[in-house]
Amino acid sequence: MSAQPVDIQIFGRALRVNCPPEQLDALNQAAEDLNQRLQDLKVRTRVTNTEQLVFIAALNVCHELAQERLKTRDYAANMEQRIRMLQQTIEQALLEQGRITERPGTSFE
């Protein structure tokens, strides 16, 4: 579906943005999250300039995103290593089983 104009409130300011209907709930949740972040920053930093608060919030979100990307990359590398180890273990077990069943003089029939 195509995006529809939607009105949201961010830190007391009305904004009209385009949003696909199926993403409206996510947009509203993001707006609530941003409002909370801005309010927390205002209290914590005592900065009253809205523009400055928005930039600080944007920097914080970018930093959090970078940290999550690092975590995801580390997790993926860890999983790849575990998969390789599991593959090696399986291959080794299959080789050993092949040696057991292929020994001369040993018949399991």
Curated annotation (Swiss-Prot):
It is found in: Cytoplasm. Signal peptide: none annotated. Keywords: Cell cycle, Cell division, Coiled coil, Cytoplasm, Septation. Residues 21-99 form a coiled coil. InterPro entries: Cell_div_ZapA-like, Cell_div_ZapA-like_sf, Cell_div_ZapA_eubact, Cell_div_ZapA_N. One of its GO terms (cellular component) is plasma membrane. Its main location: cytoplasm. The keyword Zinc does not apply. GO terms for biological process: division septum assembly; FtsZ-dependent cytokinesis; septin ring assembly. Belongs to the ZapA family. Type 1 subfamily. Activator of cell division through the inhibition of FtsZ GTPase activity, therefore promoting FtsZ assembly into bundles of protofilaments necessary for the formation of the division Z ring. It is recruited early at mid-cell but it is not essential for cell division. HAMAP family: ZapA_type1. Homodimer. Interacts with FtsZ. This is Cell division protein ZapA. The gene is zapA.
